[in-house]
């Protein structure tokens, strides 16, 4: 693809576009299915007040729910993918709007489901399973719903809580508008006096620059701007944490952490184990910080020095064809069945490969039931090859889950999702390290791997600890002020990075830049997922077929059991600190290897 000009959608060759016709051959077929969805509220309403009536009635309702799930999957995937391939196309924005209206009507019509199911007496439900054996398939789903009984309020109270929904979203919406739409940063200036625009998107590339003057200038531009609005940011974050704690309290949970993790069936101990294990392995990060300072040859290491590569770019230009070929070779340990699905995805246009005008940025995988779809904006870089391996990990997870689970258990939770993608990245990295003889390229790869550990395992755990602490402060009746948040965030940076780096005042404001603090205990899953993936990749390379078989079992499992049990089946026990300790020990070994490689 030409890099001089971004092509229009119509100019992209067919083989580099995803095959959305596999979902609907035409837009008219989509519209026909939308009419079917619009008719669903009437069918749902026929069950109101009747779910506890008989086994047959409850079973028929589960079948209708499955039918609606499949319909929404097809309608949603087609409309969203069409919109994402060219966001300027108003037609598909309209499709999404129509679909959302129909979806809201369906949800509203089915609002009786939870209260009716939790009110069925246990003896009666057991009798239903005996009367209708087919209903047993839904036992786990029904049990999961019924477990929430202690946290479901009276009808009047539920109505009041529902009315607060939009209000509860306000802190995140206000922060998002402030940070993404209103905030402007002064230009950064490089060593030659040339100016560079600073945005949320350009910030990381700027602090990755070899020009230290530019790095410092971008750093001061970003955090100096947030400093001017520190009280606003503290107020929005405080409102968010108060809202989270209000809902947890209203639903009779012991803490906001328990409330957030309950939905994904992850014990609170898993979250706290992660923080404890990383604390026990801080010395590896201190070693890495010391090595980074040494390799950059600076008198003092600052936070704006953390992102710049310590190894000059090894000029690893990798075309999309080469990336596919390398990923296939790297994932060979996964076995022929896995590779066959990977090849099917490569050959049958599951992937939308290159950038075009109006196309959504970044990369993702969407698990449509017909087959997964992957959006890329491929450039010929090492990073883009890792993105391909990562997103195909998600895609094959979706494919195997959909093929092996009934509709009701085909979705998987984020806690497991990040394992499937990151395991592929770990296998790709091990393959490249094993097959790269060029010393410069090898050092570049190790640096890339070390940065993945730093930004995923250490950094996301620090975020998770900060989030836990500010929730605990609010629960204890303490106020969240800009000064207090700065102090806490500064202390955590000191703890995680040690004395080998200067604690710049600006970094204490980083909490104000992170949108994930509005996502309610989300970030820890990046760190746990990374640890589990490293453990699984090591196991696959060490034990071969038996380990692969166990891991494929995880990918086929969907949400047929809780995520901790699912991973335990593949030999990774996330209820303990062992996988995290082992991953961090590997980070320690890589730091040593990097030091040796750069000494030669």
Regions found by a protein language model. Name each.
Residues 295-333, 339, 397, 444, ...:
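Long, K/E/R/D-enriched contiguous segments that form extended
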Residues 10-12, 25, 117-120, 140-147, ...:
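C-terminal, non-catalytic "cap/extension" segments appended to globular domains
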Residues 316-318, 351-370:
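Catalytic zinc-binding patch centered on the HExxH motif and its immediate surroundings
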Residues 252, 379-399, 421, 426, ...:
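Active-site recognition of the HExxH zinc-binding catalytic motif
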Residues 316-318, 370-389:
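Short pre-active-site segment immediately N-terminal to the catalytic Zn-binding motif
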Residues 1-313, 324, 597-600:
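A well-structured
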Residues 329-340, 366, 394, 398-406, ...:
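Conserved helix-loop functional segments at active or binding sites
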Residues 412-441, 449-451, 455, 529:
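Post-HExxH zinc-binding segment in Zn-dependent metallohydrolases
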């Amino acid at each position: 693809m030409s890099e001089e000009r971004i092509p229009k959608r119509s100019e992209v060759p067919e083989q580099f576009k995803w095959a959305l016709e596999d979902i609907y051959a035409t837009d008219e077929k989509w519209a026909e299915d939308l009419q079917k969805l619009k008719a669903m509220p009437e069918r749902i309403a026929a069950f109101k007040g009747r779910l506890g009536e008989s086994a047959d009635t409850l079973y028929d309702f589960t079948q209708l729910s499955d039918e609606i799930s499949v319909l929404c999957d097809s309608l949603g995937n087609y409309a969203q993918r069409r919109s994402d391939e060219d966001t300027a196309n108003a037609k598909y924005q309209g499709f999404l709007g129509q679909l959302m209206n129909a979806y809201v009507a369906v949800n509203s019509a089915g609002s009786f489901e939870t209260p009716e199911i939790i009110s069925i007496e246990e003896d009666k439900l057991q009798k239903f399973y005996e009367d209708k054996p087919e209903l047993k398939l839904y036992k786990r789903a029904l049990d999961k719903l019924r477990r929430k009984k202690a946290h479901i309020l009276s009808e009047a109270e539920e109505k009041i809580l529902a009315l607060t929904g939009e209000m509860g979203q306000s802190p995140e919406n206000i922060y998002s508008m402030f940070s993404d739409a209103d905030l402007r940063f002064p230009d950064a200036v490089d060593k030659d006096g040339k100016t560079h625009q600073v945005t949320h998107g350009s910030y990381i590339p700027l602090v990755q620059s070899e020009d230290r003057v530019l790095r410092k200038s971008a750093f001061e531009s970003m955090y100096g701007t947030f400093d001017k609005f520190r009280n606003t940011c503290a107020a929005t974050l405080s409102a968010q944490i108060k809202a989270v704690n209000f809902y947890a309290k209203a639903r009779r949970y012991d803490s906001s952490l328990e409330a957030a993790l309950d939905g994904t069936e992850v014990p609170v101990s898993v979250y706290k184990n992660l923080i404890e294990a990383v604390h026990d392995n801080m010395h590896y990060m201190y070693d890495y910080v010391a090595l980074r300072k040494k390799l950059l040859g600076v008198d003092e290491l600052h936070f704006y020095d953390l992102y710049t590569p310590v190894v000059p770019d090894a000029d690893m230009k990798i075309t999309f064809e080469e990336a596919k070929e390398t990923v296939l070779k790297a994932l060979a340990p996964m076995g022929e069945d896995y590779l066959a699905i990977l090849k099917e995805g490569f050959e049958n246009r599951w992937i939308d490969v290159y950038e075009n005008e109006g196309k959504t940025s970044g990369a993702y995988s969407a698990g449509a039931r017909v087959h997964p779809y992957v959006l890329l904006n491929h450039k010929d870089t090492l990073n883009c090859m890792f993105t391909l391996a990562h997103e195909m990990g998600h895609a094959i997870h979706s494919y195997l889950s959909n093929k092996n689970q009934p509709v009701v258990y085909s979705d998987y939770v984020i806690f497991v999702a990040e394992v499937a993608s990151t395991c592929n990245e770990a296998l790709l990295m091990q393959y490249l390290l094993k097959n790269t003889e060029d010393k410069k390229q090898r050092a570049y790869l190790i640096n890339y791997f070390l940065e993945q550990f730093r930004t995923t395992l250490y950094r996301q755990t620090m975020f998770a600890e900060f989030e836990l602490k500010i929730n605990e402060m609010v629960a204890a009746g303490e106020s969240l002020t800009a000064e207090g948040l700065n102090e806490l965030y500064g202390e955590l940076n000191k703890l995680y990075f040690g004395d080998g780096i200067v604690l710049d005042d600006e970094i204490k404001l980083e909490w104000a830049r992170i949108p994930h603090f509005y996502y309610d205990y989300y970030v820890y899953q990046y760190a746990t997922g990374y640890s589990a993936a490293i453990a699984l990749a090591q196991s696959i390379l060490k034990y071969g077929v038996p380990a692969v078989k166990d891991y494929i079992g995880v990918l086929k499992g969907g949400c047929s059991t809780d995520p901790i049990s699912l991973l335990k089946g593949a030999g990774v026990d996330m209820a303990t600190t062992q996988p995290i300790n082992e991953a961090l020990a590997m980070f320690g070994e890589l730091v040593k290897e990097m030091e040796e490689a750069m000494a030669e």
